[in-house]
Amino acid sequence: MKDLTMLLDELKDMSFFNKGDICLIGCSTSEVIGEKIGTVGSMEVAETIFNALDVVSKETGVTFAFQGCEHINRAITIEKSQFNPLTMEEVSVVPDVHAGGSLATYAFQHMKDPIVVEHITVPCGIDIGQTLIGMHIKHVCVPVRTSVKQVGQAIVTIATSRPKKIGGERAKYQ
């Protein structure tokens, strides 16, 4: 998937991925292949995307989390080593192609020690196919513009975050 490789390379060049961070991935494999979100799904597309992200993880030290679809309330598949019981609640669900989506399913099947959490707050994310990852991005969410606008047929939206600016007109900011 040339466009995915180009996108990930561009994000690496921008220093979008930071060692130790968790980057959220939302993906409709249906949209990638030109179909309506949630209709056909593709484990083959999921495998391609997961493997490309795995390479980025090994190169940059970023960890990826995978958002499931609305049928599992957009719950997040993560490595158990990333679990923080003070800020996350584990839920009892296993992502499935028809309830969770192909990429979350593939990730759950291929991660070392996966668990699913109800909610997560991460500093950045990549949304492939308008899966609505914003609910899991740390405030304040900031769009990231890239030259790659689609992966396959799916629209790509990328977000990072910045600290809130508080204090009013007399406050100073960096």
UniProtKB/Swiss-Prot annotation:
This is UPF0340 protein SAB1998c. Belongs to the UPF0340 family. Pfam families: DUF436. It comes from Staphylococcus aureus (strain bovine RF122 / ET3-1). SUPFAM superfamilies: TTHA0583/YokD-like. NCBIfam families: TIGR01440 family protein. Coiled coil: none annotated.
